Regions:
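C-terminal motif of bacterial Sec signal peptides marking the signal peptidase cleavage site
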Residues: 2-3
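Glycoside hydrolase catalytic-domain groove-lining segments
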Residues: 108, 227, 231-290
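Aromatic-lined carbohydrate-recognition surfaces of secreted/lumenal glycan-active proteins
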Residues: 43-46, 169-176, 199-229, 279-292
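Alpha-helical scaffolding within the catalytic cores
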Residues: 28, 55-64, 96-100, 155-156, ...
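Acidic (Asp/Glu)-rich catalytic clusters
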Residues: 34, 62-70, 99-109, 157-167, ...
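Conserved, mostly hydrophobic/aromatic
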Residues: 75, 172, 241-243
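N-terminal module-boundary/linker segments of secreted carbohydrate-active enzymes
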Residues: 7-76, 80, 89-92
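Substrate-binding cleft of extracellular glycoside hydrolase catalytic domains
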Residues: 80, 84-208, 212
Length: 301
């Protein structure tokens, strides 16, 4: 099953769920994802049901559906803001509405991704000489506050249920692009070792303390071209289900998109090899182009 009648062939990867206590629903979800790999590529769109080109909060509407007749197979929502107790996420979408959208996507046999990349800098005391990740890992007040963040995330995940009261399986995309300096957990702010510790601590807390077992975890890197780069921050097979590439067509001198396409092919090849070797699901987790720079971006690039 794929969106927009996309039928490109994809290698069949044998992969295993990282959570040893995965719910029955999550195991079924994984089986469905595996079968879809054989069918083609699932196209995704962020905030697809909430707003689009010249519209906002119109039930049943989607830009992707308007273009090709089908809803996107994958819909991504940002959980940013939930850690502070906000009723709105960072894109000003109410969390109660995101919960409704997740259920709608589930009923259509689609896939939901929940991206969570919290601002950790607010956890750091002004007089602290540590970086924020090291502060969270050290077990002081920052750790306590961070666990409160996770408590709020867990409450939201717990409420994601279908009409039968069963948990809806979702993908949580954590701490993306650690090889970028712009992230609190990124290069220059956090060592690869501390990044791995933060990731594992986060997943362990959600699984073991909050009993969350209907989630797959996605790990992603920006613009990589080799398996060695992926390995540098990789949290380990027991903590990751999906290995992804993030890459935007953001090159001022790349008007044709040829450089983007070259880097995309190299990155996806590396991701696919790494995923196959580690029995994980490969994905292009984040991509796009700001504005309509290339008219055939989706059809040819």
């Amino acid at each position: 099953l794929s969106a927009c009648n996309e039928t490109k062939s994809v290698t069949n990867f044998a992969w295993t769920v990282s959570d040893e206590r995965a719910s029955a629903e999550l195991k079924d979800f994984c089986h469905n994802l595996t079968s879809r790999l054989e069918a083609g590529i699932m196209l995704g769109h962020k905030d697809a049901l909430a707003y689009g080109s010249m519209w906002y909060n119109q039930p049943g509407r989607s830009d992707v559906k308007s273009v090709c007749g089908n809803y996107p197979a994958v819909v991504d929502w940002d959980l940013g803001g939930i850690e502070s107790g906000s009723e709105l996420n960072v894109d000003s979408i109410p969390f109660f509405r995101i919960r409704q959208y997740v259920e709608q996507v589930y009923r259509r046999n689609g896939v939901t991704i929940l991206s969570w990349n919290p601002s950790l800098s607010s956890l750091l005391r002004k007089d602290s000489l540590q970086n924020v990740v090291r502060s969270v890992l050290s077990g002081n007040e920052s750790r306590v506050e961070y666990e409160q963040y996770l408590d709020r995330v867990a409450v939201f995940l717990e409420t994601l249920k279908n009409s039968d009261g069963r948990h809806i399986p979702v993908i949580v995309h954590l701490f993306h692009s650690p090889n970028l300096a712009s992230m609190d957990w990124g290069m220059g702010h956090c060592s690869p070792e501390d990044y791995v510790r933060l990731w594992r601590m986060t997943v362990d807390y959600l699984r073991n303390k909050k009993n969350i077992h209907h989630v797959l975890y996605a790990y992603s890197m920006y613009g990589i071209v080799s398996e060695e780069e992926i390995s540098q921050y990789y949290p380990g097979d027991k903590y990751v289900d999906i290995v992804g590439l993030n890459l935007y067509q953001d090159f001022e001198s790349d008007e044709s998109g040829s450089l983007y396409k070259q880097r995309l092919n190299m990155g996806l090849s590396a991701i696919s090899r790494f995923a196959e070797a580690n029995k994980k699901l490969p994905a292009l987790t984040d991509t796009g182009s700001k504005g309509v720079k290339i008219s055939n971006f989706f059809s040819s690039i």
